Amino acid sequence: MDKSCAEHGSFSTLIWADSAENYLRWLEYGGMDVNRLPQDEEEADKATGWKSFACEACQLPASSALMTTNRCNMNCPVCFTRDKNEPLHEPSLEECEALMRRYKELAGDDALIEFCGGEPAVRKDICDLTNAARTIGFDYIQLNTNGIELAKNKDLARTLRFCGLTTVYLGFDGMSDKPYYAKYGKPMLNIKKKAVENCANAGLAVVLVCCVIPGENDGELGQIIEYAKQNMPTVKGVYLQPISYFGIYPHDKIRRITIPDVIRRLDEQCIDISAQDFGPGAYDHAQCSFNACYMLGKDGRLKALTRFSKREREENAVHRLRKNMRATWMPSQNKMLTVGGMAFQDNSNIDLMRVQRCSIQIIQRDGRLIPLCSKYLSSCDGHKIFDGIG
């Protein structure tokens, strides 16, 4: 991607490590008309004429995150949500209930809810908050967590499940301690494994979420898939996020890895996985996500249920996507595994055409829905468009 700014000059950023032909085919298979892509600055201005990072011009989200607290039980050298200069903010249970009701009004009765932070599990009333979400009518409730509280307190997992929690979206960055030192600054693998064990005993579904950092853990993706296989049906998915540079990160170690890179690593490291199993999402922008789905066979091998093929945009695609998330990421005994991921944007590669089709949004304190990449976008000096965690 080439960008030009009157104030900061011109620069280029790698957004797709593959041929131009394959890039355009990926966009086309994601439901985009590549013949209508902007060809010059004037056309680009028309395509993004709304010029807003906020929600008003965006499509409905597949899921939205309620930022429950900016407290955390870690002090990580890499974190895209945290602002060390921000004062303590933890909305009350009543405030959270009001925001969830407002979100349901905006997004529809089949909306999905996520609890984020900070670390949401440090809230003393996290179980009450979960029960409140269920009472409001959410049947898919997801906890985005580092797993520390779940690992040290097996009763917490059981109580959360009893209160209505369905899915644990667990940071899980590798099968050695090397990537945990890079991201968390300390060894964490045993804590992650204990969290998975306690979730399994509680009947919770788990999605392993890996921030893919070149040179740190991109050689361990196959091992993560194997661990997921061994822990089915508790583990329902492996979600890979190529590192983006916003929030807190080491400014002297910026290394890009793109969706094609991640898919190639999976193809090379996993005997059961082929690059041809993956395709783009048809609801969000094709450049944002990739996914495949597998069933565990009697022989212990993963069998692909998906293939790279053209996907047409549907008028009610958001509802189909929500239905699919329920079918694949909620507790069940079926041995199905999704493998996919999302490439978040930062100040070097932010694209308003992608923002406009954001499928994961943040519930703002005032009730608005903000695209995730807009919410956490920060300049090189740390300045953000939107202050605060929520």
Task: Indicate residue ranges for each PLM-predicted region.
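Radical SAM/AdoMet-radical enzyme domain recognition
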Residues: 97-114, 123-242
